[in-house]
From Swiss-Prot:
EC number in record: 2.7.4.1
PANTHER family for this protein: POLYPHOSPHATE KINASE
Cofactor annotation: Mg(2+)
Protein name, UniProt field: Polyphosphate kinase
Annotated binding of Mg(2+), by residue: 375, 405
Family: Belongs to the polyphosphate kinase 1 (PPK1) family.
Lineage: Bacteria, Pseudomonadati, Pseudomonadota, Betaproteobacteria, Burkholderiales
Pfam families: PP_kinase (PF02503), PP_kinase_C (PF13090), PP_kinase_C_1 (PF17941), PP_kinase_N (PF13089)
Gene Ontology biological process terms, A to Z: polyphosphate biosynthetic process
Record GO terms (molecular function): ATP binding; metal ion binding; polyphosphate kinase activity
Keywords, comma-separated and alphabetical: ATP-binding, Kinase, Magnesium, Metal-binding, Nucleotide-binding, Phosphoprotein, Transferase
Main enzyme class: transferase
SUPFAM superfamilies (alphabetical): Phospholipase D/nuclease (SSF56024), PHP14-like (SSF143724), PPK N-terminal domain-like (SSF140356)
Length: 687
């Protein structure tokens, strides 16, 4: 495929997205504390990138060094390019923090007190805090034959201490390790009376660098440097051998913290021989070491915007709106009976989704509730409603995806709580993550004097997660449409039972019909273009990687189909290549909210088919997951999806990045009229 149809590298594309995220921190139009937050988000994203993608690339090099990446590069060459770009990104990130953001914060009365700047009063306070709050929790480990180098946990904060002298047993002291327990605060507020700033903070590393000698009495501390090791965090569960997925997963979770090392981060001033020791102990090479000018974990600074009460330095708060069709209806069921309802988060509130489930839990007419859960958070009113429904005697069935990466433990806990109150809990289909977002409610109603069962459905592009519903852009559809409800019913039956492939009327479902329907729809546009008819494809998603879909889009471009792709993250397709993809544009929207909806638009000879989905156009979504795409039929709602989900992004000239044919992105510059998709929707919907 890559020989005939050129593809771009996935890992480089992911780093490119994080470069666009980091660019938000350099934008003076972004409030200052939000700029700090974007620096932290970049660090969090890079952590996952190393835990998953770089770990996988290293494994491939070890297991099959002669193999090629999908874009045709040798694994080692790809790895070298990714490392080089990651190093540049990290350097840019720390430079931006220290040369731009921190000085600007200081001007606003927000200051981080380094240990070498403390005056006598600050030093006395810091010593007292260390002795009272930190020292009792810390455990020094002196390295010698009886104390081997400890296996440090994934992404934990550690300090390597170079020592001189002999201890009480006469042993020559050379090196010690101090691991910082996760329970210790990484950022401590200094009293304002001592700080001299309205908001003064001290990092845990500053306490350690100044007072680590208290842990090694009568020895000379030659140096103290922080380091962090990132490990492979993929879980291995043998799907052919397991008899209980939850039990098997519970056994694997502790091992995540102790997987193979992937990356070493050290403070920039760490002596070379210390770095060599850390690399050797971690079985890492020189390329895997990242020397950073400051804290090795910037994610810990994510709490600063929450600790500082400065609304003028943050994004303006907003109140998400409630659609009149819901606000004016006696119940959610009455609102849905009156017609399909489209919710656009975060501009429209997620509360109606919660209310639908909460009302269903209490309504004596509701007999059954079925729900998929991928990510929902540790404190979820939605899960509380499901448990209340089960306690109230409803037939509650929940498909909990236990293998949702980094949410496995949370989902295991929810599954246990649901089972404890009598809900039916299933874990989907082994080998196929259930990523579809579906809720089905069965309610007994009286029509024409006769009792009958009516189904109500909610389908979404994003998770049933109230917190991220205020941070991610997503669409949700509430409907009582008979065909859609019947399709959802059958998908739930397939997930909970055993049966053959389904014949669905309205939904496209992976791993069965979703990919063929996408290809068929693209080919229909190709046929129309070749027949001289108008042809258009607009698709919005998080990632575009699947080779056969990319090949079909290239063919569409060559046939004259106008293709506009709005891909927030990684895109393997090359746009704008003469003779191949000159009719394709790719843009990425990066702003206050994480663009998350998946929208497929096909002109379809003027019929304008619009589908919403939980699926990106990636191999995993199309072939190894359970996903659904659902149509928007009501003309008014269809126009809304096109206008709010697609047109505003195509018109954005402030937060849009245009992809070039070499895979690099160029920020689209505003003309006389500034158009920002997210700000425009906030102004339209929110107060």
């Amino acid at each position: 495929m890559s020989a005939r149809y050129p593809l771009l590298n996935r890992e480089l594309g992911i780093l490119g997205f994080n470069e666009r995220v980091l660019a938000q921190a350099a934008d003076p139009q972004v409030p200052l504390l939000e700029r700090l937050r974007f620096i932290c988000i970049t660090s969090s994203n890079l952590d996952e990138f190393f835990e998953v993608r770089m770990a996988g690339l290293q494994e491939q090099i070890r297991d099959n060094p002669g193999a090629l990446t999908p874009d045709g590069m040798s694994l080692q060459h790809a790895y070298d390019l990714v490392v080089e770009r990651a190093q540049r990104l990290v350097h840019r990130q720390y430079t931006m923090l220290h040369e731009t953001v921190l000085p600007a914060l200081e001007q606003e009365g927000i200051y981080f007190h380094a240990s070498d700047t403390w005056n006598d009063a600050q030093l006395e306070w810091a010593r007292g805090y260390f002795l009272d709050e930190l020292l009792p929790v810390l455990t020094p480990i002196g390295l010698d034959p009886a104390h081997p180098f400890p296996r440090v946990l994934n992404k934990s904060l550690n300090f390597v201490v170079e020592l001189e002298g002999r201890d009480a047993f006469g042993r020559q002291a050379v090196m010690g390790i101090v691991q910082a327990p996760r329970a210790l605060p990484r950022v401590v507020r200094m009293p304002q009376s001592l700080s001299g700033f309205e908001h003064g903070f001290v990092l845990l590393s500053s306490f350690m660098q100044r007072f680590v000698g208290e842990l090694f009495p009568q020895l000379v501390v030659k140096s103290c440097n922080q380091f962090r090791i990132t490990r492979n965090s993929e879980l291995f569960v043998d799907e052919d051998e397991i008899t209980n997925l939850r039990v098997a997963l519970q056994g694997e979770l502790p091992a995540r913290h102790l997987g193979n090392a992937v990356r070493l981060e050290v403070s920039a001033d760490t002596p070379a021989h210390i770095v060599r020791r850390l690399l050797d102990e971690s079985s890492l090479g020189d390329k895997d070491c990242y020397r950073v000018a400051g804290s090795v974990n910037l994610v810990r600074l994510m709490q600063i915007p929450d600790l500082v009460d400065r609304p003028d330095l943050k994004f303006a708060p907003f109140v998400a709106s409630i659609p009149p069709a819901i606000a004016n209806a006696p119940t959610m069921f009455d609102a849905i009976d009156a017609g399909d309802i489209l919710l656009h988060h975060p501009y429209e509130s997620f509360q109606p989704v919660l209310e639908l489930l909460q009302q269903a839990a209490k309504d004596p007419s509701v007999v059954a509730i079925k729900q998929t859960i991928y990510r929902t958070g540790t404190d979820s009113p939605l899960m509380d409603a499901l448990m209340e429904a089960a306690r109230n005697g409803k037939e509650v069935t929940v498909v909990v995806e236990l293998l949702a990466r980094f949410d496995e433990e949370t989902n295991i806990n929810w599954a246990s709580q649901l089972e404890a109150v009598g809900a039916h809990v299933v874990y989907g289909v082994v080998g196929h993550k259930c990523h579809a977002k579906m809720m089905l409610i069965v309610r007994r109603v009286v029509e024409g004097g006769k009792a009958t069962l009516r189904r109500y459905v909610h389908l979404g592009t994003g998770n049933y997660h109230p917190r991220t519903a205020r941070l991610y852009t997503d669409f949700g559809l509430m409907t009582a449409d008979q065909k859609i409800c019947e399709d959802v019913h059958h998908v739930f039956q397939q997930l909970t039972g055993i049966g053959g492939e389904l014949t669905l009327h309205e939904l496209w479902q992976s791993p069965f019909t979703l990919h063929p329907r996408i290809i068929d729809s693209i080919r229909a546009e190709i046929d129309n273009a070749r027949a001289g008819k108008r042809a258009r494809i607009v698709a919005k998603m998080n990632a575009l990687l699947e080779p056969s879909v990319i090949a079909a889009l290239y063919e569409a471009s060559q046939a004259g189909v106008k293709v506009d792709l709005i891909v927030r993250g990684v895109c393997a397709l090359k746009p704008g290549v003469p003779g191949l993809s000159e009719n394709i544009t790719v843009r990425s929207i990066v702003g206050r909210f994480l663009e998350h909806h998946r929208i497929y638009y096909f002109h379809a000879g003027g019929a304008e088919e619009v589908y919403l989905s939980s699926a990106d156009w990636m191999d995993r979504n199309l072939f190894r997951r359970v996903e659904v795409a659902f149509p928007i039929r009501a003309r008014k709602l269809k126009r809304r999806v096109i206008a709010e989900g697609l047109s505003v992004c195509l018109g954005d000239n402030q937060s849009a990045w245009l992809m070039q044919s070499d895979g690099h992105y160029r920020r689209r510059r505003a003309g006389k009229t500034v158009r920002n998709a997210q700000l425009g929707l906030l102004a339209k919907f929110c107060s």
